């Protein structure tokens, strides 16, 4: 009898362990059910939980700008660099919207958009050409009195690592003497190492994601990779898509 009971108990424990493991994988690979779940995966504050259809985007990015300022002690330091790290599928323009928010406050801002291509071959606003050794410095496109924009030219890069290049790093550092804010709009963290390379150069890093465009496992990987690379994530902007 004791042996049978032991076998039954062992089988039951095995089933419980399997269910627990299955539940763990289920939770790990599912999409986060709430902003709180995103917060738990990344272990950083939720800057805003955006109900997309009703959202006033201008207010959202004002809130983000204020959050990032508070994180540096509330003072307007000259030349603060901020890296936008989108994870999963959804937001490609969060960096632009943040840069516009800084510019609206009359802060001289440079956006380096690593997602957007430059306007044609003759455009002088490509950071790629400069990093690849072009003697002439990039000429940012002027969006308004307070906002300048640089893009990248992926085709011209030919898989050369532009963001990890020393010329890119020194350019960002140099621009901190000219601009009050430098915003780097990085590509999707899940698909490119550029966001981490840019993150190492910046004073502040924040994450943006849509709940419908990311799973928990990707969020855990982002948290761990940032920790390994010594990148502090200030907070996350969550869209309820």
Where are these regions (language model features)?
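Switch II (G3) loop of P-loop NTPases
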Residues: 149-194, 199
